[in-house]
Design a protein with these regions (language model features):
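Walker B catalytic acidic pair
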Residues: 194, 376-378, 384
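Catalytic P-loop NTPase motifs of RecA-like helicase/translocase cores
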Residues: 198-199, 381-385, 420-421, 444
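Helical/strand "switch-coupling" subdomains that flank nucleotide/phosphate-binding cores, especially
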Residues: 208-319
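Conserved helicase/translocase P-loop NTPase motor core
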Residues: 313-372, 381-389, 395
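Basic- and hydrophobic-enriched, low-structure N-terminal and domain-boundary segments
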Residues: 1-159, 163, 177, 366, ...
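Glycine-rich phosphate-binding loop of nucleotide-binding enzymes
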Residues: 132-216, 426, 437
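Conserved ATP-driven motor cores of ASCE-family P-loop NTPases powering translocation/secretion/packaging/pilus
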Residues: 398-403, 407, 411-487
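Loop/turn-to-beta-strand initiation segments
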Residues: 186-190, 332-335, 367-372, 406-413
Length: 495
């Protein structure tokens, strides 16, 4: 440890400011960890671990609001004296070091107490986690590669949010840090790769992973009907047309199989064959309506529907791999990635409904899943103002989150932002208990629910968040044994 200064006037049990020794202002920087020997080197009241934030440089002769000789001298090109300059940092206490780990500090931090900078050999995390059952991430404290970051294993199923603007490194962080962590904790990982570019290309050749295209997966019949409802503008607003679609969807897998066989035998497009089967079925149902007025209305609605609805709209829901078979593949693989690239939004959301309903039913049966569900582009599933099928997906995420805490289901939601149009629905976000904040979008810099509201109580400003380098994240919440957010980073493996 290195002595760097003493506690200044105005300290409390939760705040202190250290005045740096002369010459250390260029060496000591924000986010470093320090140890306060509260009360002095000899017989201190306690020893407090803290993190440096909020640096401040003071020179009373260089105030921009008053005219002094030093200011005049500087205006004409001179260099004023630095003899009375004072440099300081605020200290956010992490906790008191005890034989059982860390405890909250309840004693006033005494002015004049010496402050020591922790160096590479003074790894503090062994002190933090003495009581907790922890795993160690491959991430480390910024500036100290040997200080691996501990994670409280118990809180993994309490759900995770990863936030960062484009280019902040959130996908890399998830691939290289979170997914290996979940596997180390005994979880199987299912990744929903919304664009098909952030995860699927990196796991295609991995022996412990499998990539499957969304178009190969079938949906449950309720989700197929929700998808068709969205694509047909609520079946043209006609109950008879809706009933016709509903009856066709019954036994969907068999109908898809029949269309595939016929297409192969006759050299046709499978989706065109299935489309014709569906259209003929709907027209037949309408033809059998006995009430003349109802029949006329259904015919008009049917024409509207099939002007809007095209054969290619069926392609995303013609898969044959069931959700049960998809989850079954997790028994032999650590990781399965669903490549959703190229599919229509409605098809992606329809698949998620099928998956989430099945997961929920398993948990209702009392089964512990031990699955981590990683959802890229989470606002697509749970936007701030959900409409249509997104209302259903948002509600299902809330249900999964509530029951998942008890049934070992981890939800990891990845988003460009925290609030508003780039963020996750507020009701869903309240279910996430661990957060990784990367470089934020300017829309998140202020206002209710933004990054500033989450982190400013810990001395982290929006200015800092806007300027974070890629791959740097503030780690906060239930999985972090430290009650104060810590700035962490990682080194992606070569190749």
């Amino acid at each position: 440890m290195k002595f760097i200064g003493r506690v200044a006037d105005g300290s409390t049990e939760t705040f202190a400011r250290v005045i740096l020794l002369k010459g250390l202002e260029g060496e000591v920087v924000a986010e470093q960890l320090v140890l306060i020997k509260n009360g002095g080197d000899e017989n201190p009241l306690n020893q407090i671990l803290g993190v440096l934030r909020g640096g401040l440089g003071k020179n009373e002769f260089l105030s921009p609001t008053s005219y002094r000789p030093d200011v005049a001298y500087m205006r004409y090109g001179g260099e004023p004296s630095g003899a009375r300059e004072v440099y300081s940092f605020s200290i956010k206490p992490i906790g008191v070091i005890t034989g059982d780990g860390l405890e909250p500090n309840l004693a006033i931090i005494q002015p004049r107490s010496p402050v020591y900078l922790l160096e590479e050999e003074d790894n503090p995390f062994q002190l933090i986690v003495k009581k907790d059952e922890v795993l160690w991430m491959d991430a480390f404290m910024e500036g100290h590669e040997s200080w691996k970051i501990p994670v409280n294993k118990f809180f993994i199923p309490y759900h995770v949010g990863v936030y960062g603007s484009t280019g902040s490194g959130k996908s890399w962080f998830t691939r290289f840090i979170l997914i290996p962590l979940y596997i180390k904790a005994g979880y199987r990982v299912l990744v929903l790769d919304w664009s098909g570019t952030d995860y699927a290309p990196y796991y295609g050749s991995a022996s412990n992973a499998e990539v499957i295209s969304l178009t190969d997966i079938t949906l449950d019949e309720d989700s197929i009907l929700s998808y068709l409802k969205d694509k047909t503008n609520d079946f043209g607003g006609n109950d008879n047309v809706k009933d016709a679609f509903d009856s066709f969807v019954e036994g969907w897998l068999e109908k898809v199989g029949k269309a595939l066989d016929e297409a192969m035998a006759e050299g046709k497009d499978p989706e065109k064959v299935l489309y014709d089967l569906l259209k003929n079925h709907v027209n037949k149902v309408i033809e059998n309506i006995t009430d003349r007025r109802s029949k006329t209305a259904a015919e008009r609605a049917g024409r509207r529907v099939f002007r809007r609805f095209k054969p290619e709209d069926l392609e995303p829901i013609m898969g044959l791999v069931t959700v049960e078979e998809l989850l079954g593949r997790l028994k032999s693989k650590d990781l399965v990635v669903v490549d959703m690239g190229g599919a229509l939004t409605e098809a992606k959301l329809g698949f998620f409904l099928s998956l989430s309903k099945h997961l929920y039913s398993l948990m209702e049966e009392g089964k512990d899943l031990k699955i981590a569900l990683v959802m890229d582009e989470a606002p697509q599933y749970a936007p701030w103002d959900p409409k249509g099928i997104q209302r259903e997906t948002t509600e299902m995420i809330k249900n999964l989150a509530a029951l998942g805490r008890k049934r070992m289901l981890n939800l990891t939601l990845i988003a460009q932002g925290i609030k508003g149009e780039i963020g996750v629905n507020a009701a869903v976000r309240r279910n996430l208990n661990t957060h990784f904040f990367g470089r934020i979008h300017p829309l998140d810099a202020s206002g209710e629910g933004g990054a500033s509201e989450w982190l400013s109580p810990y001395g982290i400003t929006p200015d800092q968040m806007l300027q974070l380098k890629p791959g740097r994240f503030y780690f906060t919440g239930a999985m972090n044994p430290s009650p104060i957010p810590l700035l962490i980073t990682y080194k992606p493996p070569r190749g």
